[in-house]
Amino acid sequence: PDQAVWNVAPGKPLFISEFGGEALYGKHGDAEVKSSWSEDYQAQLYKDNLEMFKHIPNLRGTSPWILFDFRSPFRFHPHQGGEWNRKGLVSDQGQRKKAWYIMRDYYNQKKTEQ
């Protein structure tokens, strides 16, 4: 993330949406292994994204993909998630994943910077 160079529409406001990754609530594992579907991986991915965003001078907002895990029968994954899209910050049962707290802290920090 520290080495990313951003030169996107200089002088114009930029909003980034649909960033993030998948995680099964309660699953823990190697934060560097995407296929682990762990909360640790998802949390690290959000941390990396937010670190990159610091280097975008014209960034004006973000919107992670997605808030809640949701049923998606056309997106069947036989090993992880089944008929569910598990990229939410909150599980389909309302449990907050580790990445939810990363984003909460990020937005709280942004509020104090204003």
Residue ranges and their predicted role:
Residues 1-114:
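Substrate-binding clefts and catalytic carboxylate motifs of secreted carbohydrate-active enzymes
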